Structures are given as C-alpha cells and as structure tokens.
C-alpha cells in the first residue's frame, strides 16, 4: 500500500463538477492499494500517517501530528501510485490490486482512521475521474509504502 501525504491548508475533490469532499488544515492522502495488501498494511499506514509529525510547533519545528493539531484528512484512491515505469514509456499497473479488493481495503482504511482516531475526514469517489484541488502548506510531501520500499 502506498501513500502520498501532503500537508495542506485546504483541499477538496470534485466529481462531475460536484464537490464530494473538502477539508481545511490537515493532510491530503493519495492512497494506492497493491495486490497482496491486507489489514497489516492498513494498520501500518493509518498509524504512520495520523502520527507523522509534520506540523510545526510553537518554535517552528516539525513536531506535531495531524492528530495533535486536530486536523482533517482528505483520502483519495489512486491506483496510479503503483505504476511501474522502469520499462518503456507507458506505466504498467500490474501491481495494483483489482478494483474490488482495492475498494474494500480503501474503505477499511477510511473506517480505521475514523474509528480509531476520530479525525474529521472526507473522501473522493472510488473508480471515478476526480479533480483534486490541493493548497499545499510548506510544501511538505511525504511518500510512504507499507512494504517500506522507501
């Protein structure tokens, strides 16, 4: 499971011209589900993302998490994070989980954030073309992989 985590002042997502999710200060999370991912991957990434200390404290040091500041999350599914571009010029998405499995794990990821941490969150729409507007704060962008590839 892969995530691109961006610290944002504001972020929202539109589907077919309609706003379906919006947050203020917090994290924009683009989430890709890999074939073979499961509950352990969800647990690892949710815990890592919610407790990642990338918000500034009173001294300007990155020392606070989204949980510490009472921030929000916008979680958007993005299978293209699993694209392999090592050969040729067209990404290969063979490592991405099937849509059925990816949707199930995506929903479990969202539920875990809400249930275990009680954070306010919004989501995109699975398997839909989305327009995402992100107002980066910093910018601060972190790449995470549950298999700890980077």
UniProtKB/Swiss-Prot annotation:
Keywords: Cytoplasm, Hydrolase, RNA-binding, tRNA-binding
GO biological process: D-amino acid catabolic process
InterPro entries documented for this protein: Daa-tRNA_deacyls_DTD, DTD-like_sf
The keyword DNA repair is assigned to this record: no
GO MF term (any one): tRNA binding
Main localisation: cytoplasm
EC number: 3.1.1.96
Catalytic activity, as annotated: glycyl-tRNA(Ala) + H2O = tRNA(Ala) + glycine + H(+); a D-aminoacyl-tRNA + H2O = a tRNA + a D-alpha-amino acid + H(+)
Any Gene Ontology CC annotation: cytoplasm
Record-linked Gene3D superfamilies: D-tyrosyl-tRNA(Tyr) deacylase
Subcellular localization: Cytoplasm
Enzyme class of the recorded protein, top EC level: hydrolase
Span(s) of short sequence motif Gly-cisPro motif, important for rejection of L-amino acids: 138-139
Protein task: An aminoacyl-tRNA editing enzyme that deacylates mischarged D-aminoacyl-tRNAs. Also deacylates mischarged glycyl-tRNA(Ala), protecting cells against glycine mischarging by AlaRS. Acts via tRNA-based rather than protein-based catalysis; rejects L-amino acids rather than detecting D-amino acids in the active site. By recycling D-aminoacyl-tRNA to D-amino acids and free tRNA molecules, this enzyme counteracts the toxicity associated with the formation of D-aminoacyl-tRNA entities in vivo and helps enforce protein L-homochirality.
Family assignment from sequence similarity: Belongs to the DTD family.
HAMAP family: Deacylase_Dtd
Quaternary structure, from the entry: Homodimer.
Record text about domains: A Gly-cisPro motif from one monomer fits into the active site of the other monomer to allow specific chiral rejection of L-amino acids.
Protein name, per record: D-aminoacyl-tRNA deacylase
Species this protein is from: Natranaerobius thermophilus (strain ATCC BAA-1301 / DSM 18059 / JW/NM-WN-LF)
